[in-house]
């Protein structure tokens, strides 16, 4: 397996389009832990093959394929037989997506009845978006992305009320992320056995409480890295015990180092 720090990859974003991020990764064998994103994620396989587990289904992705991953859907996309693969990932803010799709009302969950897409014109449209971002053509991006979004098989679903153990965990994470509750504390405060808490949270989110806490910390760390905070401070801000723990956890859930993520390129850099 190649070292994460040596993998050629770039994160493109711009403060003028805060609802958009593009990741481009080349010839990577780096695996992911099961994770989720608050954004709608759309991936394109450029070379190699990827095994994608998403919402309990397995998909074998090949060059020219697109994969649509709804917000908060648990997934992992890993190399096949430890062979390198290259891919782009678009991350689109869920609120922005709803605003572009009148068929998905505010507050509704975004789902995709057909995650795997083998559609050459749609793949070409995705590649055009990537090309615009790499050229720094900022003005054309919103309209082009809206067209792409309208072509994706998305639909609305009523949000499901979480189990009270999950709701309690969400509340504690929002109140004090660095002091996230232990499983013992969560079980005590929800008056449930630890096994019941794990089962309830996993049923609601597809992740264990420990993974959910790690993901919340990673997402917070990403916001601080995007804001330009020093890497040495971000791990502590997010609640990690030390820099080693922060680095290892960040890599395992994002397949990138904190430094790679922090050293992003603005969409307008190439102008």
Residue spans for each PLM region:
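Residues that scaffold the ATP/ADP-binding catalytic core of kinase and kinase-like folds
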Residues: 53, 99-101, 212, 234, ...
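N-terminal regulatory/effector-sensing and dimerization cores
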Residues: 9-107
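Short coil turns linking two alpha-helices in DNA-binding domains
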Residues: 189, 193-194, 241-242
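Short hydrophobic/aromatic patch on the recognition helix
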Residues: 64, 197, 201, 245-246, ...
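Compact structured core domains
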Residues: 81-160, 166
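A short, Lys/Arg-enriched amphipathic alpha-helix from helix-turn-helix/homeodomain DNA-binding modules
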Residues: 117-130, 142, 153-190, 211-229
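Terminal helix-turn-helix DNA-binding modules in bacterial transcription factors
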Residues: 175, 184, 202-247, 263-271
């Amino acid at each position: 397996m190649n070292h994460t720090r040596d993998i050629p990859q770039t994160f493109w974003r711009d403060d003028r389009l805060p609802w958009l991020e593009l990741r481009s990764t080349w010839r990577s064998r780096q695996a992911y832990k099961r994770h989720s994103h608050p954004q709608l994620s759309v991936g394109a396989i450029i070379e190699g093959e990827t095994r994608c587990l998403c919402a309990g289904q397995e998909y074998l992705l090949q060059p020219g394929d697109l994969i649509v991953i709804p917000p908060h859907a648990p997934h992992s996309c890993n190399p096949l037989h430890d062979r390198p693969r290259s891919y782009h990932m678009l991350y689109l803010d869920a609120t922005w997506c709803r605003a572009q799709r009148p068929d998905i009302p505010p507050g509704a969950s975004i789902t995709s009845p057909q995650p795997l897409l083998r559609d050459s014109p749609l793949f070409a449209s995705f590649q055009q978006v990537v090309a615009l971002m790499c050229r720094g053509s900022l003005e054309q991006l919103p309209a082009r992305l809206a067209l792409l979004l309208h072509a994706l098989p998305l639909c609305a679903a009523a949000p499901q009320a979480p189990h009270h153990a999950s709701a309690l965990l969400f509340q504690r994470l929002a109140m004090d992320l660095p002091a996230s509750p232990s499983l013992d504390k969560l079980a005590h405060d929800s008056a449930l056995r630890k096994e019941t808490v794990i089962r309830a949270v996993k049923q609601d989110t597809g992740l264990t409480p420990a993974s959910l806490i790690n993901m919340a910390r990673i997402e917070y760390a990403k916001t601080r890295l995007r804001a330009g905070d020093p890497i040495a401070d971000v791990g502590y801000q997010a609640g990690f015990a030390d820099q080693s723990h922060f680095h290892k956890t960040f890599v395992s859930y994002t397949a990138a180092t904190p430094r790679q993520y922090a050293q992003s390129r603005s969409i307008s850099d190439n102008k």
